[in-house]
Regions:
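N-terminal beta-strand-loop-alpha-helix module at the start
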Residues: 1-71
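Active-site-proximal binding-pocket segments
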Residues: 229-401
């Protein structure tokens, strides 16, 4: 069925929330609006993407669908890539306007999105909103920080005000509930992974700013204490179940009255760094495959699949490294310092090319954020040409390890 009247189409990707969502807020401000998430099967099997990340995405979409239902809207799933979606929109909604938030992702998605944006931008039908303060055009390092701060201090948008009763139900799209039923997913055996959803993100932020952040600036480096002392918001930030602006403003609000000022300041700095690294990948997308310093690509050219498999499985024979890998596989998360150690071990001790180990490690992270992961992989592999190489000692004795074991490790 072809809709000749104007329709606003909101395209979701890494902004799976109802509050402070510019694309959703402005896109739903019309008599007729359609909210779509594009499920591209190939995307979820591409460079570093994995089933555990998709499960978090599904959790988040499910909660968002429930919130939209209360506003008399449904979340629809388009099955296909962005090229196919563009053709579908042109065929069925030739007068539509498209609303989406800016996001930086892996090469596979970036190329498809660039073509999608170009197609609709040229006709003045596309509206893309800033989310992380990433400059997509005319990148200027001199005003980057001031621009980031401007975005983080803007007014937080409420949920969209949808007062219209008219609903669009395209026959060739599945609503979220039907899509999830079609997937026939078996409940994951591992219930140790974090669950997605905006409500869970807000609860984590509240508990972190309340008591959990006590000692954060020190405890975040500990493989024992970090699990409970870190914010644990990383997957929620990556999938956009809470806006970075919301987090930033809550931190600012607590700054004067909190007794954890040092910890708050340390956390606030990391919000800035988060976007700094994503900007790096946005500006230099080739970093996904090539070393920052071109001469370093010839350092480690041949990979040893057997070594890489033992590393991923936590079967290297180095107790501390193996314990960290088993923990990561079980939880889908480990603290930043241990991530650095794991990657450094693969690049220095095993002398494996980061291009082979990077996606394998990324698959284990529920919170995989390409911009951060890829930049950190290169830093820990010593291929940036500007960062001091760090080699971590993993020769921890069994006696020392046993003293700090969790119940499982």
């Amino acid at each position: 069925l072809k809709y000749s009247s104007p329709v606003n189409i909101v395209l979701l990707h890494k902004n799976l929330r109802i509050s402070d969502n510019s694309a959703l807020y402005h896109g739903c401000n019309a008599d007729k609006s359609l909210i779509i998430y594009a499920y591209d099967k190939d995307y979820w099997s591409n460079n570093g993407k994995s089933e555990r990340q998709f499960q978090f995405c599904l959790d988040s979409l499910g909660e968002l669908d429930e919130k939209l239902n209360k506003l008399n809207r449904d979340l629809f799933i388009f099955e296909g890539d962005l090229d196919e979606l563009a053709l579908w929109i042109d065929k069925n909604f030739p007068q539509s306007k498209i609303f989406l938030n800016q996001s930086t992702d892996i090469h596979y998605h970036r190329n498809l999105k660039a073509k999608f944006i170009s197609k609709f931008e040229d006709s003045g039908r596309l509206y893309e909103f800033e989310d992380f303060g990433i400059q997509t055009k005319n990148h200027n390092r001199d005003d980057w920080s001031s621009n980031w701060h401007r975005i983080m201090t803007q007014k937080i948008l409420p949920p969209p005000q949808i007062n219209h009763s008219s609903k669009i139900k395209p026959k060739d799209l599945l609503d979220f509930k039907a899509f999830k039923k079609k997937l026939s997913l078996v409940d994951p055996k591992n219930n140790s992974f974090q669950l997605g959803g905006e409500d869970k993100a807000k609860k984590l932020l509240s508990s972190f700013l309340g008591k959990r952040m006590d000692g954060y600036s020190i405890k975040m480096s500990s493989p024992v204490e970090a699990e409970h002392s870190c914010s644990r918001l990383s997957p929620h930030i990556s999938f956009g179940t809470i806006s970075l602006r919301t987090i930033f403003q809550e931190v600012q609000k607590n700054m004067d009255s909190s007794i954890f000022k040092k910890d708050l300041y340390s956390f606030k700095k990391r919000l800035h760094w988060h976007c700094h690294f994503i900007q790096k990948l946005e500006t230099e997308p080739e970093l996904e495959f090539k070393s920052m310093h071109p001469m370093c690509d010839s350092l480690r050219e041949e990979g040893n699949d057997e070594l890489i498999e033992k590393w991923i499985a936590g079967e290297t024979g180095f107790p501390f490294l193996d314990a960290c890998m088993v923990f990561l596989k079980e939880k889908g998360w480990i603290n930043f310092r241990m991530r650095a150690m794991i990657m450094s071990f693969a690049s220095y001790n095993l002398w494996q090319p980061w291009q082979k180990t990077s996606p394998r490690l990324a698959e284990l992270f529920v919170d995989y954020e390409p911009g951060i992961h890829i930049c950190q992989v290169q830093m820990q592999s010593g291929v940036t040409g500007i960062n001091l190489p760090r080699i971590y000692s993993v020769s921890v004795s069994y006696t020392h390890l046993r003293a700090h074991e969790t119940d499982r490790h």
